[in-house]
Amino acid sequence: RPAWLSFTLEILQTVILALLLYFMIDSVLARVRVENVSMQPTLQSGNFILVNKLAYKLGEPHYGDVIIFHPPDGSVEDYIKRVIGLPGDHVEIRDGKVFINGNELYEPYIAAPPRYNYSGDVPEGHLFVLGDNRNRSSDSHEWGFVPLESVIGKALVVYWPLEEIKNLVAPTIVRAANGP
Protein backbone atom coordinates (compact mmCIF):
# COMPACT_ATOMS: atom_id res chain seq x y z
CA ARG A 1 0.00 0.00 0.00
CA PRO A 2 1.44 3.42 -0.93
CA ALA A 3 2.45 5.70 1.94
CA TRP A 4 0.06 8.46 0.83
CA LEU A 5 -2.88 6.02 0.94
CA SER A 6 -1.98 4.81 4.44
CA PHE A 7 -1.63 8.41 5.60
CA THR A 8 -4.99 9.38 4.01
CA LEU A 9 -6.75 6.39 5.61
CA GLU A 10 -5.26 7.25 9.00
CA ILE A 11 -6.50 10.84 8.73
CA LEU A 12 -9.93 9.62 7.60
CA GLN A 13 -10.14 7.22 10.58
CA THR A 14 -9.15 10.04 12.95
CA VAL A 15 -11.78 12.39 11.51
CA ILE A 16 -14.49 9.70 11.70
CA LEU A 17 -13.54 8.89 15.31
CA ALA A 18 -13.60 12.59 16.23
CA LEU A 19 -17.05 13.01 14.65
CA LEU A 20 -18.38 9.92 16.44
CA LEU A 21 -17.08 11.22 19.77
CA TYR A 22 -18.57 14.65 19.10
CA PHE A 23 -22.02 13.23 18.32
CA MET A 24 -21.90 10.85 21.31
CA ILE A 25 -20.96 13.69 23.66
CA ASP A 26 -23.51 16.02 22.04
CA SER A 27 -26.30 13.49 22.63
CA VAL A 28 -25.51 13.50 26.37
CA LEU A 29 -24.34 17.06 27.04
CA ALA A 30 -25.64 20.45 25.93
CA ARG A 31 -23.74 23.71 26.06
CA VAL A 32 -25.89 26.65 27.14
CA ARG A 33 -25.14 30.37 27.39
CA VAL A 34 -26.87 32.23 30.24
CA GLU A 35 -28.60 35.28 28.76
CA ASN A 36 -30.24 37.05 31.72
CA VAL A 37 -29.99 37.94 35.41
CA SER A 38 -32.70 35.64 36.81
CA MET A 39 -30.21 33.18 38.34
CA GLN A 40 -27.82 35.72 39.89
CA PRO A 41 -25.74 35.40 42.00
CA THR A 42 -25.30 31.71 41.08
CA LEU A 43 -25.10 32.35 37.32
CA GLN A 44 -24.10 35.53 35.54
CA SER A 45 -25.24 36.69 32.13
CA GLY A 46 -22.61 35.44 29.69
CA ASN A 47 -21.73 32.27 31.65
CA PHE A 48 -21.50 29.07 29.62
CA ILE A 49 -22.72 25.90 31.32
CA LEU A 50 -22.75 22.18 30.57
CA VAL A 51 -26.12 20.44 30.86
CA ASN A 52 -26.66 16.69 31.34
CA LYS A 53 -29.49 15.83 28.93
CA LEU A 54 -29.85 12.29 30.31
CA ALA A 55 -30.16 13.25 34.00
CA TYR A 56 -33.95 12.97 34.16
CA LYS A 57 -34.28 10.16 31.65
CA LEU A 58 -32.24 8.05 34.09
CA GLY A 59 -33.33 9.62 37.39
CA GLU A 60 -35.63 12.05 39.14
CA PRO A 61 -35.24 15.79 39.82
CA HIS A 62 -34.14 16.79 43.31
CA TYR A 63 -34.59 19.89 45.42
CA GLY A 64 -31.99 22.47 44.44
CA ASP A 65 -31.24 21.09 40.96
CA VAL A 66 -30.56 23.81 38.41
CA ILE A 67 -32.47 22.80 35.27
CA ILE A 68 -32.90 23.91 31.66
CA PHE A 69 -36.41 23.62 30.22
CA HIS A 70 -38.74 24.77 27.47
CA PRO A 71 -40.83 27.58 28.99
CA PRO A 72 -44.57 27.02 29.43
CA ASP A 73 -45.33 30.35 27.73
CA GLY A 74 -44.00 28.97 24.43
CA SER A 75 -41.20 31.52 24.02
CA VAL A 76 -38.27 30.55 21.82
CA GLU A 77 -35.43 30.67 24.35
CA ASP A 78 -35.14 27.96 26.98
CA TYR A 79 -35.18 28.91 30.67
CA ILE A 80 -32.78 28.05 33.48
CA LYS A 81 -34.15 27.93 37.06
CA ARG A 82 -33.76 26.05 40.34
CA VAL A 83 -36.10 23.21 41.37
CA ILE A 84 -37.90 24.25 44.55
CA GLY A 85 -40.99 22.02 44.62
CA LEU A 86 -41.51 18.42 43.48
CA PRO A 87 -44.78 16.69 42.56
CA GLY A 88 -47.14 16.58 45.55
CA ASP A 89 -45.39 19.39 47.47
CA HIS A 90 -47.20 22.36 48.96
CA VAL A 91 -45.19 25.52 48.17
CA GLU A 92 -45.69 28.71 50.13
CA ILE A 93 -43.80 31.99 49.83
CA ARG A 94 -44.47 34.55 52.55
CA ASP A 95 -42.58 37.16 54.53
CA GLY A 96 -39.55 36.75 52.26
CA LYS A 97 -39.23 33.03 52.94
CA VAL A 98 -39.99 29.85 50.97
CA PHE A 99 -41.71 26.92 52.68
CA ILE A 100 -42.10 23.41 51.28
CA ASN A 101 -44.68 21.26 53.06
CA GLY A 102 -44.52 23.71 55.98
CA ASN A 103 -40.72 23.59 56.32
CA GLU A 104 -38.66 26.70 55.65
CA LEU A 105 -35.98 26.22 53.02
CA TYR A 106 -32.40 27.19 53.75
CA GLU A 107 -31.37 29.19 50.68
CA PRO A 108 -27.89 30.73 50.95
CA TYR A 109 -27.72 31.11 47.16
CA ILE A 110 -30.48 33.72 46.60
CA ALA A 111 -29.76 37.35 45.69
CA ALA A 112 -32.44 38.73 48.05
CA PRO A 113 -35.59 37.43 49.77
CA PRO A 114 -38.70 37.42 47.56
CA ARG A 115 -40.98 40.45 47.86
CA TYR A 116 -44.07 38.52 46.82
CA ASN A 117 -46.37 35.87 48.26
CA TYR A 118 -47.47 32.59 46.73
CA SER A 119 -49.25 29.40 47.76
CA GLY A 120 -49.96 26.29 45.70
CA ASP A 121 -49.67 22.53 45.33
CA VAL A 122 -47.35 21.04 42.71
CA PRO A 123 -49.34 18.64 40.51
CA GLU A 124 -48.06 15.20 39.52
CA GLY A 125 -45.69 15.30 36.57
CA HIS A 126 -44.68 18.92 37.25
CA LEU A 127 -42.04 21.00 39.06
CA PHE A 128 -42.12 24.36 40.83
CA VAL A 129 -39.05 26.40 39.86
CA LEU A 130 -37.66 29.78 40.91
CA GLY A 131 -34.75 31.93 39.80
CA ASP A 132 -32.10 32.66 42.45
CA ASN A 133 -32.59 36.37 41.74
CA ARG A 134 -36.11 36.06 43.17
CA ASN A 135 -37.30 39.59 42.46
CA ARG A 136 -35.99 39.73 38.89
CA SER A 137 -37.08 36.30 37.64
CA SER A 138 -40.05 35.18 35.60
CA ASP A 139 -40.73 31.74 37.05
CA SER A 140 -43.32 29.42 38.61
CA HIS A 141 -44.64 32.08 40.99
CA GLU A 142 -45.85 33.97 37.85
CA TRP A 143 -46.69 31.35 35.21
CA GLY A 144 -47.16 28.12 37.13
CA PHE A 145 -45.58 24.70 37.02
CA VAL A 146 -43.09 23.15 34.59
CA PRO A 147 -44.18 19.84 33.04
CA LEU A 148 -41.46 17.20 33.50
CA GLU A 149 -41.54 16.49 29.77
CA SER A 150 -40.43 20.11 29.14
CA VAL A 151 -37.18 19.62 31.07
CA ILE A 152 -34.12 19.40 28.82
CA GLY A 153 -31.60 18.53 31.51
CA LYS A 154 -29.67 19.31 34.66
CA ALA A 155 -26.97 22.01 34.77
CA LEU A 156 -23.65 20.52 35.86
CA VAL A 157 -20.92 23.14 35.72
CA VAL A 158 -20.09 26.68 34.67
CA TYR A 159 -17.14 26.27 32.31
CA TRP A 160 -16.72 29.80 30.94
CA PRO A 161 -15.37 32.31 31.71
CA LEU A 162 -12.49 30.42 33.30
CA GLU A 163 -12.38 32.61 36.41
CA GLU A 164 -16.02 31.66 37.15
CA ILE A 165 -15.73 27.87 36.77
CA LYS A 166 -17.90 26.17 39.39
CA ASN A 167 -19.82 23.01 40.11
CA LEU A 168 -23.62 23.45 40.02
CA VAL A 169 -24.35 20.01 41.49
CA ALA A 170 -24.31 20.72 45.22
CA PRO A 171 -26.21 18.23 47.41
CA THR A 172 -26.49 20.59 50.38
CA ILE A 173 -27.96 23.57 48.52
CA VAL A 174 -31.54 23.15 49.72
CA ARG A 175 -32.41 21.64 53.06
CA ALA A 176 -34.77 18.69 52.69
CA ALA A 177 -38.33 19.87 52.33
CA ASN A 178 -39.69 16.89 54.24
CA GLY A 179 -38.15 17.94 57.53
CA PRO A 180 -35.04 19.34 59.23
Specify the residue positions occupied by each region the protein language model found.
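PP2C/PPM family metal-dependent serine/threonine protein phosphatase catalytic domain
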Residues: 100-115
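Phosphate/adenylate-binding glycine loop and adjacent helical scaffold
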Residues: 131
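Active-site loop architecture of trypsin-fold serine endopeptidases
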Residues: 135-144
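Solvent-exposed soluble domains appended to multi-pass membrane proteins
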Residues: 119-124, 144, 149-150, 179-180
